[in-house]
Amino acid sequence: NEYHGFVDKANNENKRKKQQGRDDFVVKPNNFANRRRKDDYNENYYDDVDAADVV
């Protein structure tokens, strides 16, 4: 079934990224911490504080 193939592909990609993140963390923990903070900032970024209150 094509749908399941798509989901499996996405799940595998996520696993790979997580593992890559762990590997990076072991090798260079300081870079990891900085990159993580930047990513969180980008994901939770709102143009306007009010945007966070809109449901």
From Swiss-Prot:
It comes from the Eukaryota. GO terms for biological process: defense response to bacterium; defense response to fungus; killing of cells of another organism; positive regulation of cell population proliferation. Residues 1-26 have a biased composition (Basic and acidic residues). Residues 1-39 are annotated as: Disordered. Keywords: Antibiotic, Antimicrobial, Fungicide. Possesses antifungal activity against B.cinerea, M.arachidicola, F.oxysporum, R.solani and C.comatus. Suppresses the activity of HIV-1 reverse transcriptase and stimulates the proliferation of murine splenocytes. This is Cicadin.
